[in-house]
């Protein structure tokens, strides 16, 4: 039962980040708003265990977050959104890697 609550929480975080990305897109029409939405979508896919390569998504999202963090001179709210939005993705990929060590990855 605890695992189900955790999964619902990760899905909630993902939807929340997508909503914030859409609001950011409405307020400031910028390419970085799309990255926030993509972070939320990737986290949603990973937390729902949709069968796409979560490791590849995690690498792409981490690269996008890193590139954005380099371009931002001070701590901007978008970097915080990227970090929070990437949490479900990191947790899902971590559980995938933990399962693959035991021979149970992505089943």
From Swiss-Prot:
Membrane topology: Multi-pass membrane protein
GO cellular component: plasma membrane
Taxonomic superkingdom: Archaea
Keywords from the named record: Cell membrane, Membrane, Transmembrane, Transmembrane helix
Transmembrane stretches, start-end: 9-28, 33-50, 55-72, 77-99
Subcellular location: Cell membrane
Protein name (record): Uncharacterized protein AF_0098
């Amino acid at each position: 039962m605890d695992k189900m609550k955790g999964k619902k929480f990760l899905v909630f975080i993902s939807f929340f980040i997508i909503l914030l990305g859409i609001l950011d897109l409405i307020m400031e029409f910028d390419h970085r708003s799309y990255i926030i939405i993509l972070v939320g979508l990737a986290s949603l896919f990973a937390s729902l265990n949709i069968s796409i390569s979560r490791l590849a998504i995690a690498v792409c999202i981490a690269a996008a977050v890193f590139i954005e963090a380099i371009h931002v001179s001070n701590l901007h709210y978008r970097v915080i959104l990227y970090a929070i939005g990437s949490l479900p993705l990191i947790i899902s990929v971590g559980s995938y890697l933990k399962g693959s060590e035991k021979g149970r990855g992505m089943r």
